[in-house]
Every structure is written in structure tokens, then in C-alpha cells.
Amino acid sequence: MKIFQWSILLVSFSFVSLSFAQKKEINATVYAQWKKNENQQISSNGRYISYEINPLFGDGFVYLYDTETAILDSFPRGKQAGFSFQSDYFVYKIVPGYDTLRTCELRKIDKKKWPKDSLGIIVLSTKNLQKLSDIKSFELGKEHNFLSYFKNSDELYKAIPVKKKWWKKSKKPVKAIQSDGTALTILEPISNFSKAWLHVTNCELSKNGTYATVTTHQKTKKDSYQLDVFAFAQQKTYQITQQQTAIPSVVFSDNQRHLAYLSSQDTSALKKYDLTLITLDSLTAKAANASKKIVLSDSLKTISMHQNPVFTLNGNLLYFGINDKQPILEKDTLLESEKAHLDIWHYKDLRIQPQQLVQLKQDEKRSELMVYYLHKDLIVPLSNDTLNVAIVKDLHADYLLGSVSYPYEIEYQWESAHRKDHYMVSLKDGSTKLLAKGVAFDGKLSPKGKHYTYFDSKSKKYIHLDPLTMNEMCLTCAQPSINWQSDINGMPMDADPFGIIGYSRNEDSVYIQSEKDVWIYSFVSQQLVCLTEELGARNQQEIALRLWENDSVFIDRSNVYFYGFDQLTKGFHLYDFDDKQGLKKLYSANSSFVQLLRSPNKKTLLFRQSTLEAYPEVMFTTNNFLSLQTISKTNPQQAGYNWATVELVKWKSYDGIPLEGLFYKPENYDATKKYPLILYYYELNSDNLFSHSAPKPTASIIHPTEYASAGYLVFIPDIRYTAKGPAKSAYNSIMSGVDYLLKTVPSVDSTRMGLQGQSWGGYQTAQLITMTNRFKAAMAGAPVSNMTSAYGGIRWGAGINRQFQYERTQSRIGKTLWEAPEKYIENSPLFNVPKIQTPL
């Protein structure tokens, strides 16, 4: 009997050992197995949650979870899912199979003949599923229960073929209407309401679904567009305009009293546009004054099609744009290749020529902002060719904030903080009032126009200005030890402030973010108080205010929660706030915070967190984190693979700076063995201790899980940059970390160490192998080898030069090439190539 028991025990141990030993290695062949959890949604009533799980290649699923019944449904090839406004039906797009589309592409089949998307509609009370074919796009209402969808084809129903008779009957064929539009349907599945149109190019529904606009198109000798309004209550269609050559924009006011649209009857390429205002009540009453064309007083200006009309939230004002009228060029007989094109360059240009060329189309579309008073029939100009004014929909005052950049634009070539002059712009008459000159970071004008606050980069303090009296005062001078600026890790530039969060509803206070806490300045008591009671500073947490909904221009404390990143553990804390009790901890974990959504009825929270080992699955709570339920399982196959473990290591650089780094080991790590070591680096990474690293293709960087799975140790040290320059700073940080590991981890094989970096990390790799020969091999992706030549290079995507990068930002030289040529040479790997012995 004992022999039998020992046999069972030995067999059990054998199975355990075999199971662990048989864990597979992660490599490029398994990328397709790993999936992503995407597009998480929560219904308005908080009962339903949906998400997608999609592989790198292949067909995914959309999932629907009922939090009351705990039933999880899945639907193959589902994408872009959403819930109706009233949470009574669920919609998702059904895409064709991956293999089907791949076959079509391989066989070079015309894309018009490829299988099309479908639409799945589920009535949640009955779980009945309806499928609609040939879907181009769909849209759900945010504050109404309608669903609108376009088909790819311009037909509602396919004609049923009629059986042919033996005799022929001559009949004049009906000429098919040619159109750029397709079939549109507006549907309400619960009430079974459905309305369809043909030849539709655009559809807009009003905020709560009282009206819908339908723009239709027919091709005749010229394009012919027609705009109609459908009133759901009357079940009637009202024609707004027809025989237009373009209707590029249609917009409802939020109060659903008015409609504005742009249109043109010109047949030329340079069209002149009209802006027309429709009073919807008058339209449905068939009143003669339902339509009003907005006329400009300046005959040299025209309505811009590049600035969509925007109503203010109260519906009293309408923003729109104007342009200079463009001359119509006379036709000629020259070929395009025979025409001369002239570019004029000047050394005093505010933008260099490559940047001008990149931004040419943007400049051509630039509009001057105007505002129209609906009840006064008054147009007020707000901006011009130098003054930029930001549109505010939720207006609470007669002022907007404007900015002028042209006095400083030429210095943008070498400065990273872009200075601007800030103005208060009157909505009543367009007059401007200078608030502050040379503001390097965004200032904030309060919604009611009582306060203007900005961060002064010279004094490193927040300054308040009373726009009425122009009196200034310092808001943060009472707290000189508080850090209001972000960590820029040695870049020779002005650091960004953490920012002005916003103003209270009655504008008696302003919320300001510091490095570790949230502060509130009272304009009544003229005192700066820490709203978070300096909990962040005491506990080494970076506590930040976050909004549940971005639906107000004010800070409402019932709409906030607080997130705290723990600088010591790299975990996080979530807090609620009570005016009497202050911060109240909701949840904390040694993991990485990924996502938090709240249902509109505030009953359900959707939550995601991760660690290196644990994928950020979809979780939910209905009791403020007293309990959490996990509902997704994205990558169960991970259990069969040799994964990685990670630990936070701490040491000091050669020049005494405290440093941190991430040290990864294989899951099956054996401390008695020797392992090769791979180093990867890019600025600061230790805060990513709990980030999940899933296998996937990369752009020339390494994934530590993949290398650890293959039997490597991976070290990702933080690099702290000092005035010694990027080369010496990187050397002191990286090599001191290597020495620390060799001293404390005997399993590191010092004869088999490698370097890997991409972009700025690639530069560090190229530079490091000119300074040491301790590494067996190195890989430098997209490095800069010669800073002297790169200094005047062009970033072709933006058209800007790289000068600022070396003088102010990541390259951290801090001087021009002529002021310190020795620094550019010292920090350029090219000039020390003869010293390199490491295979690269």
C-alpha cells in the first residue's frame, strides 16, 4: 500500500515538473494567438457592458454582459458596438470573415464585389437578433433612441424578377438616377418605427431626435443637391433647398429651434457659399419667414466652407467663418508642365519654407471667425489673420480668449515653449483687450470672464489677472516649496506646468494641479488651500483630479474622482471626495491603472487594471469597489507559455543620483544558472513596473516578456540626464546599473551582455559602444550618429527644423552649434567610431 502511495506521489510530481517544463517559449510564431480587449462600453442604465476581443489576424468577437443575470453572450466578427440612449437595444457591425477578405485580395477581386458589412440589432428585453446587410455606416443617438444607417448601395429593396411573357411589349426604359448618395434608414427598433430615403449623402439628427436633415444628390449636367427636414412628430418632410451644387455642412442648434447650413449654386471650382438660417417652428408652420440668408457687409469677403457653423449651447449665437474672395483665373491653353511656379524664400520668414509647404493646405483653409446674433440680426467679427479665437459653445459671458503668435513665431525654430500674447475678445463688438504678453503656456479665462489665470515661466508661479481692473496677484507665492512643473529630466527648457484644472461654478475659486496634490485658490478669502490635504506629498503619491464626464466648463465636485500614482510602489489609489470628510479611498492596488468608466445613471463602474502577468480584463462594480467582478478572459493561452517576472531595483549612478530600473527574469528562472543580459532603455521607464507586456510585432524595440521567455534577463534602467550631457549621463546611469546587477545577481553572465535601443534609445546605444567594450553585441534602431549634421536637419512630417531639439529638448545640448561645437562633437558617436569594438 505504501509503495502504491509513493508511486502516485512520484507520478504526481512528475506531471507537475513535466507540465512546468513543457511551458512553451514565446516567439514571433505566437503573435497571432494574442488578442486585444477593445472598445469597452457601458449602457446608460448601467446594466449592460460590452467589449471586443480581437486577434492580431483573424476574426474577433463582440461580447455582451448582463450585470443583473451574469449572462455573457458573444457574437462573431462584431465591431463598433453601442447601446441605445434608453438602454433597450444593442447594435454592432458584423464584418466579413478575415479569410474571406484575404482571399478576395489575393485573387485581386474588384473591391466593389467584396462582401460588405452587416448590422446586428439586439432588443435587450427579448434578446431577439435582427441582421441587416450591406451596411456602410451607422450612428446611435446620444440623447435620443433612433438609429441611423447608410447602405453601400443606393437601393432599399431588390426588385423581384417578373416571369417573362412570350410576346414582346415595347416599353421605354426608365433612366436610373445617378447619385453619389446611398440608401439611408432611420430606425427605432422598440417602436418598430422606420423611415428610408434614397440618394442620401448626409444625415443629421437634432439633439433629442425631434428633427432629421436629409441631404440628397443627383448627377445631371451639374451636381444637384437637395436638403430636406423630416419632423418626427408630424411625420412630414419639409423641403429646405434644392438645385444646389454643394451642401457641405448642416447643423442643428441644441435647443432644436434653428438649423443652419452652407450651400452653393456655383459650378466653378472656386465656389461662393451662402449661410442660411432656418427657424424650425416657422418651417413646420409653413411661415414665409422660416428661412433667412446671412449677408456679409464686406463685398471682398465670402462665407468659408472650411469653418463649420456652430451654435452656442443656448442657441442664441452662431459661429461661422469667412475668407477673402478668390479671383477667378482666366482659362488658358498652357499645359500644367508649361506653367511657371514661384516660391519666394526669405530669411525673415516666420516659418521656414518646408514648414510653409507642409502647412499650405491648412493655411488655405484658414478662416476668420465671426459670430451672428440670431435675435438681433447682427454679425460681429471675432478673429483676423493674426488673432486666433477659440470657440466656446457653453457661453456664460460676453468674452472669449484670443491669442496672437506672430511676434514670436520665428523663435519657434529654436524654442520649445511657444510664447503668445493673450487677449480678451468681446462678443458684443469684437474689441480686444490685452491680458498678458509672451505667455509660454496656455492661460485660462474663466467662463464668466471674471478671472484670467496663467503660469509665469520666469517666476514659476501662477498669476491671476482681474480683466476688469487689470490688477495682478500671485496665487501660489504662499507655497514656494510646492512643485508646479512636470519632470523634464534635464531638458534645457521651461518645464510644462501641471496645469489649471478649472473654475468653480460660481467662479469664487480656481483649481490648480501640483506635482503631488490638487490645490484650490479662493478669490474670496484670497487663500491657497490644498484640497487633497497634502496627502500626495506625505505619502509620495501623485494625486490628480479627474472628471467622470466632460460635459461642463466648470468644476463640479459631484463630477470628480481622484487618481493617485504611488511613487514608491508604482501602484495606484482611487479616491472619492466629500466636502465634509475630504478624500475617501475607494480602491488601491499594486497594479497599473488602465480604465475607469461610469454609467450615466452612476450605478455601475467599468474598471480595468493590469500587472506584467495579468492582462487588463474588463471588471465592474456596483458598490463603489466593495466588490469587483471580472467578466472577460482575453488570453487564456498565456498559462501555457513561459512568461516573465519583474522587480523594481534601486541603485545610485556614478555621480550619486538615486536611480530605479526594471529587472525581468524568466518565469522558470533558476538562480543557480547563468543567463545572458539584454539592456533596453528610453528616458524613464520604472513607473511602468505593472504594465502588461503582451507578445506582438514591434517597431525595432524589444518586449521583455518575449526575451525573458527565451531565457534572457532583461534590464530597463532609468536614465537621469544632467548638465554633463546626454552621453555621460546615459553612461553614468546605465553602466552603474549594470555594475549593481553584477554585484547583486550572480546569475547574470557578464560575458554575454547586449544593448538595444530605438530612436533616442538607439542614439544612446550607438554612443555607449564608443565609451565601453563590455558588451557582446548591440542594436541601435534609427539613431542619430552626427549631431552636427542633424542640428540643421528637417523633420519632414512637420516641415520644421531640428534646431530646437538640440538646444532645448531631448538631445539636451542646451547651446547652439556655434556656441558649443565641442558638445556636439563629444555627444556624436560618429567622431569616436574608431573606438568601437562591439558588433553593432
Stretch-by-stretch model annotation:
Residues 369, 618, 651, 661, ...:
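Conserved hydrophobic/aromatic pocket- or pore-lining residues that grip, position, or stack substrates
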Residues 694-840:
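Active-site-proximal cap/loop segments of hydrolase catalytic domains
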Residues 445-447, 454-455, 567, 608-612, ...:
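C-terminal substrate/ligand-recognition segments
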Residues 685-687, 714:
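Serine-hydrolase catalytic-loop signature spanning alpha/beta hydrolases and amidase-signature enzymes
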Residues 632-673:
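N-terminal cap/lid segment of alpha/beta-hydrolase-fold proteins
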Residues 20-616, 620-621:
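Beta-propeller folds
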Residues 1-25, 784, 793, 801-804:
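Bacterial Sec-dependent N-terminal signal peptides
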Residues 673-684:
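Short beta-strand element of the alpha/beta-hydrolase
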